[in-house]
Curated annotation (Swiss-Prot):
Keywords: ANK repeat, Cytoplasm, Metal-binding, Nucleus, Repeat, Ubl conjugation pathway, Zinc, Zinc-finger. This is Regulatory protein NPR5. The BTB/POZ domain mediates the interaction with some component of ubiquitin ligase complexes. Homodimer or heterodimer with BOP1. Interacts with PAN.
Amino acid sequence: MSNLEESLRSLSLDFLNLLINGQAFSDVTFSVEGRLVHAHRCILAARSLFFRKFFCGTDSPQPVTGIDPTQHGSVPASPTRGSTAPAGIIPVNSVGYEVFLLLLQFLYSGQVSIVPQKHEPRPNCGERGCWHTHCSAAVDLALDTLAASRYFGVEQLALLTQKQLASMVEKASIEDVMKVLIASRKQDMHQLWTTCSHLVAKSGLPPEILAKHLPIDVVTKIEELRLKSSIARRSLMPHNHHHDLSVAQDLEDQKIRRMRRALDSSDVELVKLMVMGEGLNLDESLALHYAVESCSREVVKALLELGAADVNYPAGPAGKTPLHIAAEMVSPDMVAVLLDHHADPNVRTVGGITPLDILRTLTSDFLFKGAVPGLTHIEPNKLRLCLELVQSAAMVISREEGNNSNNQNNDNNTGIYPHMNEEHNSGSSGGSNNNLDSRLVYLNLGAGTGQMGPGRDQGDDHNSQREGMSRHHHHHQDPSTMYHHHHQHHF
């Protein structure tokens, strides 16, 4: 790193520390979602034309005067009815606390990370341990940041966010792509519009489905793109055959979407017909994983009884099986039906995590941390039952393997060694000790449920601002800690 780069980096961090430290030398305070954010007029005015005009237009903010970025003027908005902000504090409306801090972080330092904290529980992302690189939570945060940067006139941040969205939509769900498509149309972001419209055109969704999510003129343009693409493919057909792969992939995607709609409506018979008549591969289409996450126990049971799905099939880069997902959901019904159909409680993900590891970690979180954010939806009794089911299944498998090993040894050694009685076998194998340990865990979990208050008390606004900044300032985490540290960062 050159001396110039080092100097600029140091300058950026120095300014960012002013924001992180909150009240140090602060001369303006904002109220966002009931939380105070301390800042510095000179920095905001120097970095944003909006704030420059805002501060020039009001020498001393009145209690009911606020900033509303949905008002397109660059002066203080009209008084906010019902505002309860104390004198000297400027209420900010229509922008969330997290997005406002990201905006200020960029204004102070020129740098920002517009993604949620890795593995952080988010209300619009149901996957435990998600890295939030292209899920709905990541897309929504980027869209909110883009809107705020446009409203406050921070064009550099808007360009940075557009680039990030362009990379996100390549892997995002089609629903999220359509959200970005609508936003790019409203804000005249032509490159992002082009990227998203082509992705939607290739999705294979029929016009009647698109019309439920998109304006009719947008649907018309999508259909025009499809027509042009179809003509282009036909013109290349004598010379190219790679389009066959694309067509086959489109057909496979459509097949998977039909399968999921059938599962959503509990129509397992239709799925059976697709397997028999259309060659649908339930494993590659992750049918069982989807059913465990989104459907009822009866649907999962019926799907397993078709005999066409591998109950231990690993999915995605992490290699999670349906039992891993059921353990993360803390669903005794799903755990039980999967174990009934020979799901392996000892199967490991790519990171070496078993379903039992997941449940033990969740139990530990309850015992030692209390009801922390991300675990509040989990019922302790269900967690205890899931742990008991998976642990019992693991012990049964262990005993069967031990018996098979003993039988093999007995066949190989005809009477040379005396047989050990069952009591001695079970004691020496550690089975009773494991059972005792598991009972202690159950007792502790049950006893702890009465004390599961908040994980920590609310700090003051100064500490809250420091924590809010830290969530997006420290973003590196060891993937091996996916299950043991995913509840560290919360407000």
